[in-house]
Curated annotation (Swiss-Prot):
SUPFAM superfamilies, alphabetized: Thioesterase/thiol ester dehydrase-isomerase (SSF54637), Winged helix' DNA-binding domain (SSF46785)
Record keywords, A-Z: DNA-binding, Fatty acid biosynthesis, Fatty acid metabolism, Lipid biosynthesis, Lipid metabolism, Repressor, Transcription, Transcription regulation
Job description of the protein: Transcriptional factor involved in regulation of membrane lipid biosynthesis by repressing genes involved in fatty acid and phospholipid metabolism.
Highest taxon of source: Bacteria
Regions that span the bilayer: none
GO biological process: fatty acid biosynthetic process; negative regulation of DNA-templated transcription; negative regulation of fatty acid biosynthetic process
GO molecular function: DNA binding; DNA-binding transcription factor activity
Keyword DNA-binding in annotation: yes
Source organism (scientific name): Bacillus cereus (strain 03BB102)
Entry protein name: Transcription factor FapR
Family per record: Belongs to the FapR family.
HAMAP family per UniProt: Transcrip_fact_FapR
Length: 197
């Protein structure tokens, strides 16, 4: 029989878990620590840890409008919460009723693709960035009410074809649900290569 953690030990682990993953839900924390959601909420209150929505806003306080060059922020699918141009970016997409099939409440795949693709465009440090090629894989269906966290990483700024390779991995909680590799065309290549995509 597994020994229950003390309140102090649980709260320390809860704090570490939230610091590592500020987007984790109270439900996921309750499951992880095998306690009720109310216990998680009380622990958070005692530790002065805000609820998920406030944590997301806090992480997103950085002004990304000035950071993103390749498209207006309102054209990004999901909310960018972290970005370092030509290096990495993170966005969050809440799956709502308008994003799912009515019959089974599963998100339409083009929304997951759009989140990943727009993040791959946004992370490029250019005025113009277009997707030249993509290879994608849906790993499991995403359902109504789930929160998709997409993480983009620039792997190769100028590959042999003069393109930038961006890899995107999307998660629900800690579960991988989508992957994509995007070859991105950059505006600096346009002036160097003429009109060739």
């Amino acid at each position: 029989m597994k020994k229950r953690r003390s309140k102090k030990e649980r709260q320390e682990l809860l704090q570490q878990t939230i610091e590592t993953n500020p987007f984790i839900t109270d439900e996921d924390l309750a499951e992880k620590f095998q306690v009720s959601i109310q216990t998680v909420r009380l622990d958070r209150m005692e530790l002065s840890i805000p609820e998920l929505r406030e944590r997301i806003k806090h992480v997103a306080t950085k002004q990304h409008e000035e950071d993103v060059k390749s498209l207006p922020l309102e054209e990004v699918v999901g909310e960018i919460i972290d970005i370092e141009l030509d290096r990495h970016a993170i966005s969050i997409f809440e799956v709502k009723v308008e994003h799912v099939f009515k019959r089974n409440q599963i998100a339409r795949g083009h929304h997951l693709f759009a989140q990943a693709n727009s993040l791959a465009v946004a992370v490029i440090d250019e005025e113009l960035a277009l997707t030249a090629k993509s290879t994608i894989r849906y790993i499991r269906p995403v359902k109504l009410g789930e929160r998709v966290v997409a993480k983009a990483r620039v792997e190769d700024v100028e590959n042999g074809k003069g393109r930038t390779v961006v890899k995107v991995r999307s998660f629900v909680g800690e579960e991988l649900v989508f992957t994509g590799t995007f070859e991105m065309y950059r505006s600096s290549n346009y002036s160097e290569e003429g009109n060739n995509l």
